[in-house]
Amino acid sequence: MSERVPSIRAEIVSVGDELLKGQRVNTNASFIARSLGSVGIPVVRVTACSDFESEMASVFREALGRADVVLVTGGLGPTRDDRTRKAAGELLGLGLRLDPDALREVERRVTAHGRTMSELMQGQAMVLDGSRAIPNTRGTAAGMIIPAGERFGGSHLVLMPGVPVEMEAMMELTVQPWLRGLSDTTIIHTPVKTTGIGESTLADMLPDIEDSLPEGTSLAYLPHGAGVDLMVSTIARDPLRAERDNAAVVEAIRERAAAFIFAVGTASLEETIIGMLASGGLTLSVAESCTGGLIASRLTDVPGSSVSLMQGFIVYSNSAKEELLGVSRGLIDTHGAVSEEVACAMALGCLRRSGTSIALATTGIAGPGGGSPEKPVGTLCLAIARQVPGSGPSVGVRTLHMHGDRLQNKHRFSEAALRDLWVALRGEQGG
């Protein structure tokens, strides 16, 4: 794969001791990187630094020497440890001025809360000489776009608050449109989402595709608990070429790994399942023991799920399995509550009592107790029953073994159940 150096390079600097101490997660950098990618500007480095002015100035100097645009978050607030303006001003030899539009916005917000304007609050409207103020529609501290001058080869320094909602509004309303005017490239990111396959196994399926990627196209593996997301990224000056090259790689991956791909795009597995149920005119019910309602919860997170998900049973105790689903006591005594026989009975009982097209049932041992040599912690019995026109219900079942603590096992159980449900729905639709 050959790579082309982009015309504009960006760096992100996140200011705050709380980041270095692990007291906050740096979600700002992720948001900014995605925003930059959408306008064809790649991020070449992300740095976190302390609130000390000397440290900030050093980081800003190095970043401006490497990148065309340096985006900084944090240190614009009214407290003593908010020193980003001063550090940037001293580095660039720029003084501060009061921006009248920013001041009016600060005054409006302060008086709206019944407070009196203070010198510290007025400082929120201070911007560096020669900069363009960035309005803060969600807070008080103004941001700024600062030309760094010939000393730094015409690079720009962009200062924004560290409060995520304030920074995000600035990026979307002001910074992103400004950046779009700087970039002469188009970048396309296409997620390809898989389930039921590990990273190394998937990579073994795609070596020739990776070896023949078009110029400017890259393939990233993003593993997670349920599978691996692939990100196909293409950057090119010609928008039509970017779309063509990206689509060709995505299609090649789809043909090679079709059995594991549930979505091309941003849809989650839950969204995909609800969409398949709705498009097929199918209804679903769930009977959960070890997952305790987690499967139903995940499915109902999807808007419009009420069209397809009809009913759920949380049958944690043996008596609940008997009373709500009609599982016989003899079956439980003979095989145990965690068994394929009981899972099948749960799924069939759920199907019968709900009247849905498909029923899903889980019974297992999440831990930390309850395991045995024959049925260790992490054992899951998973059954899916369905109505077969003209021949009555059918049921399929399998046993899986997970390794994790209680919460990890519950999540993995739900992932396995959703994955099997997706596979079953593909069979219903001839996929």
UniProtKB/Swiss-Prot annotation:
Domain of life, source organism: Bacteria
Pfam families associated with the record: CinA, CinA_KH, MoCF_biosynth
Disulphide linkage map: none
Annotated Gene3D superfamilies: 3.30.70.2860, CinA-like (3.90.950.20), MoaB/Mog-like domain (3.40.980.10)
PANTHER family from the UniProt entry: NICOTINAMIDE-NUCLEOTIDE AMIDOHYDROLASE PNCC, NMN AMIDOHYDROLASE-LIKE PROTEIN YFAY
Family: Belongs to the CinA family.
Name this polypeptide is given: CinA-like protein
Organism: Chlorobium luteolum (strain DSM 273 / BCRC 81028 / 2530) (Pelodictyon luteolum)
